């Protein structure tokens, strides 16, 4: 087994005593880095499992509904409910690195592992280290699976299968509000202007990027940090994103953390019904949570938990 890096050593270890496991301390504020979104916050939520191969079943079927998974989970003293267990935020870890240290992760008492976004992304600027462009993981170029950070789709499948052998579930960060700001980097099957809000649609200044956070229409229709804002009222866009999430679940993902969730309108928030959340959330995952930072005038924050649970970053 390869030695742990200094960052990975922060994982910590736990000890057994009388059959009880004392959890390693929970992941701290690393997750605050996890989004570029103009209201940075974390959202809470809800989650797949099998061993020989991950198939197109639900997360529950492959984990809590799987006798082998349950035996491993109970043996490692891990929480049955993901809400009550510690989550290891494996920030910028590859699937292979996570897989190589699964024994330590289980021994430390982590119920779940959260990965970086697993979709295809904009590549780093030529000549620059990827660590200087960490935010590219929040700039999808399409809805394929696999990128320079997490690794290939096959490596993700192997990592989730290994996690399930240890009774651990896997949450993937998911960017479902926008794509990269670089139109040329967007993959061909997504290069359709109807799939994105126009730069003028939200009524924002500065080519659609100057968002008034007291105006919910602008928050949900303008282009956050110039990122191409998905037309989430478009049923085909919703169907495509649902297909991506369902495929990720089939690859062994148990849950999702939805980046910039407050930048996506609620189903009946405006005059025109938005099918987005109603379409994408029934994807077979067991645990889903959204990033919703309170504080914006006009934000109906309590309405989001009706769709998925929300953990706020409270302003002090």
Please report, for each region that a protein language model flagged, where it lies by residue.
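Active-site-proximal helices and loops of the catalytic beta/alpha 8
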Residues: 54-86, 97-110, 116-140, 155-172, ...
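Flexible, glycine-rich active-site loops centered on histidine and acidic residues
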Residues: 183-192
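Active-site mouth loops of central-metabolism enzymes
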Residues: 86-96, 226-239
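Aromatic- and acidic-residue-enriched carbohydrate-binding clefts of CAZyme catalytic domains
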Residues: 81-85, 121-161, 192-229
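Terminal targeting segments of Actinobacterial cell-envelope proteins
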Residues: 1-23
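Sec-dependent N-terminal signal peptides
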Residues: 21-40
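Residue-level preference for long, well-ordered alpha-helices that form the structural scaffold
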Residues: 148, 152, 233-237, 269, ...
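C-terminal region of N-terminal signal peptides and the immediate post-cleavage residues
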Residues: 37-59
């Amino acid at each position: 087994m390869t030695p742990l890096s200094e960052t990975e050593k922060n994982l910590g270890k736990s000890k057994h005593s009388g059959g009880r496991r004392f959890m390693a301390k929970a992941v701290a504020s690393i997750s605050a880095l996890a989004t570029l979104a103009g209201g940075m916050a974390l959202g809470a939520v809800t989650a797949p499992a099998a061993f020989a191969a991950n198939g197109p079943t639900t997360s529950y079927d492959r984990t809590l509904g799987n006798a082998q998974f349950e035996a491993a989970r109970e043996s490692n003293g891990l929480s049955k409910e993901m809400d009550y267990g510690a989550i290891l935020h494996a920030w910028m870890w590859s699937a292979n690195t996570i897989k190589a240290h699964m024994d330590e992760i289980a021994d430390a008492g982590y119920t779940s592992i959260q990965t970086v976004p697993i979709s295809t992304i904009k590549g780093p600027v030529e000549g620059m280290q990827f660590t200087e462009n960490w935010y590219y993981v929040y700039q999808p170029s399409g809805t394929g699976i696999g990128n320079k950070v997490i690794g290939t789709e096959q490596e993700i499948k192997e990592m989730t299968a290994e996690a399930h052998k240890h009774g651990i579930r896997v949450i993937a960060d998911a960017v479902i509000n926008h794509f990269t700001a670089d139109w040329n980097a967007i993959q061909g099957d997504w290069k359709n202007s109807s799939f994105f809000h126009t730069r003028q649609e939200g009524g924002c200044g500065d080519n659609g990027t100057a968002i008034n956070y007291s105006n919910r229409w602008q928050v949900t229709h303008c282009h956050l940090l110039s990122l191409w804002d998905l037309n989430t009222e478009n049923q085909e866009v919703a169907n495509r994103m649902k297909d991506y999430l369902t495929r990720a679940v089939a690859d062994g993902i148990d849950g999702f953390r939805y980046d910039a969730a407050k930048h996506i309108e609620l189903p009946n928030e405006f005059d025109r019904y938005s099918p987005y959340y109603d379409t994408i959330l029934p994807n077979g995952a067991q645990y889903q949570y959204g990033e919703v930072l309170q504080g914006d005038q006009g934000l109906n924050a309590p309405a989001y938990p009706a769709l998925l649970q929300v953990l706020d970053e409270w302003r002090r």
